[in-house]
Amino acid sequence: MTTSSRTCPVPAVNGHMTHYPAAPYPLLFPPVIGGLSLPSLHGLQSHPPTSGCSTPSPASVETQSTSSEELVPSPPSPLPPPRVYKPCFVCQDKSSGYHYGVSACEGCKGFFRRSIQKNMVYTCHRDKNCVINKVTRNRCQYCRLQKCFEVGMSKESVRNDRNKKKKEPTKQESTENYEMTAELDDLTEKIRKAHQETFPSLCQLGKYTTNSSADHRVRLDLGLWDKFSELATKCIIKIVEFAKRLPGFTSLTIADQITLLKAACLDILILRICTRYTPEQDTMTFSDGLTLNRTQMHNAGFGPLTDLVFTFANQLLPLEMDDTETGLLSAICLICGDRQDLEEPMKVDKLQEPLLEALKIYIRKRRPNKPHMFPKILMKITDLRSISAKGAERVITLKMEIPGSMPPLIQEMLENSEGHEPLTPTSNGNTAEHSPSISPSSVDNSSVSQSPMVQ
């Protein structure tokens, strides 16, 4: 016997007791369960209650409503907005959080940590007051570290962080197990010095500009061309000096040294000028401080090569290469056994192997959380070769645009790069190959040492 205010109790479902009206089909269940039945969601939605219970009271209706709502998952609450940090206090790049006491980007955080943990001692080649921002931060390590201290980064935080990590059990193999051997470390240091002493960084230069044809493109601005060709000649001499300082380079035959220099000279020229790119002004700066915008670079002689070079410069920016990486990549471009007409390609390959290993280890130690950075940087050699091939063609077309003769060093070093024979008329009207007028020993009065520099 039931009353009008009583509902039919049901067994627990998934561990919960609840109340529902009687099932619409009570005769389908054995009488031994006392008229109780499991609720049918389908029945609840499409049939009114029938025999077994009277109309439920308002209190039981409230209970039913609550129980039904429990079976329907509530929509997820919206995620809180991502936390926005102030820009990096050191370089003004996008911050990834508070590191060692200040808001900092991943690059400056890692730089400060490595500098403190390894007790690095840096030197500034200017007045110890270099501008540090996200473009120039890799150009002077001394001033970057000083700025880290100035904005409040704490040495003690680095030491505490290191001790904490030592106590934590390692869940996976560390990515910082790459260690330089003494030989590779010495090789890396020699190449870094060779690069820095033959190519001053942007922060060491006193920039100056010119208004010559700055607003519109012309076929060739002869004033800019004269200045550019003068600077290009000096740059080539510096590249030869850089090559002579590479361990093992002067142990190669003179013919192979000349072959490698001619094949890679334009690669290194482009790589070097692109590291002096300033994206905010879209300009490039030469070694005497002359700063040209994109239009002026076109008019100075780059012509159709201009946009390719500026695109490559933009692609280098996210790699954040420092002087050591640029020097090693330049050395790998130069000492390459797949160049045409080498007398001893196997010996050249053997010299390149430690350069590749040094670059790989240096990149992995500098960027332990970016294991794919080494192949990314190495693949830039392919881009450089593609631009250089077009650059060699541009040198040939320039000969028809300039009123005088091509500066001999530019013609000898660039026009005779791989796949492009120099065009010098002979007495019978045919073209003949230049005899090499430039060699590593003829750039200055010193002779080429034939003793290997590697141990």
UniProtKB/Swiss-Prot annotation:
**Where is it mostly found?**
nucleus
Compartmental location = Nucleus
**According to its record, what are the GO cellular component terms?**
nucleus; transcription regulator complex
> What PANTHER family does this protein's entry cite?
NUCLEAR HORMONE RECEPTOR (PTHR24085), RETINOIC ACID RECEPTOR BETA (PTHR24085:SF5)
Descriptive protein name: Retinoic acid receptor beta
Question: What's the entry's take on its domains?
Answer: Composed of three domains: a modulating N-terminal domain, a DNA-binding domain and a C-terminal ligand-binding domain.
**Tissue occurrence:** Both isoforms expressed in heart, lung, kidney, liver, brain, lung and testis. Isoform Beta-1 is highly expressed in testes and brain. Levels increase during testes maturation. Isoform beta-2 is predominant in heart, kidney and lung.
Which Gene Ontology terms describe the biological processes this protein takes part in? cellular response to corticotropin-releasing hormone stimulus; retinoic acid receptor signaling pathway
Task: Name the domain of life this protein comes from.
Answer: Eukaryota
